[in-house]
């Protein structure tokens, strides 16, 4: 009887241990004003002038990250127009709100990963991290922290 009971306990333990881990590859996400923001769709584009543009959308919200290059490096935002981030949204009434890092009080960084397991232009994907404060015309600030873009597919050159 003890053996049967032990066997039943072991069976219950092993059948209840199910791993429900979902991998988010590729992905663009971060914390917008302390709440998790995850993109539904995203693309990375290399431009003819050598810059990188990553566009990520979630419903009626869009984040655009632009760097002056696509080589692994840290790109400081708000210094010039070539390195910038923007966030835009459309509310229920159809009014658009646009936030930019090139406005006063806009700051941040985009870091392109140099790890060949994460960024491989020949295979067509790029990874890195970002954080930024962006300001709209009324002076309101939206901030993104702990942002990550991981193995975002490069869709082409424009």
Go through each PLM region and give its residues.
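Surface-exposed helix/loop patches within compact recognition domains
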Residues: 28, 38-123
């Amino acid at each position: 009887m003890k053996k049967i009971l032990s066997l039943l306990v072991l069976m219950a333990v092993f059948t209840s241990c199910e791993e429900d881990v979902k991998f988010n590859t590729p992905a663009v996400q971060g914390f917008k004003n302390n709440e998790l923001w995850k993109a539904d769709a995203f693309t990375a584009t290399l431009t003819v002038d050598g810059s990188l543009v990553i566009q990520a959308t979630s419903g009626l919200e869009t984040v655009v990250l632009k760097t002056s290059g696509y080589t692994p490096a840290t790109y400081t935002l708000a210094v010039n127009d070539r390195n910038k981030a923007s966030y835009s949204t459309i509310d229920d009434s159809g009014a658009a709100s646009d936030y930019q890092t090139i406005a006063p009080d806009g700051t941040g960084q985009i870091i392109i990963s140099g790890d060949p397991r994460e960024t491989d232009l020949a295979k067509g994907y790029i990874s890195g991290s970002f954080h930024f404060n962006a300001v709209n015309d009324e002076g309101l600030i939206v901030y993104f922290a702990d942002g990550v873009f991981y193995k975002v597919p490069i869709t082409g050159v424009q």
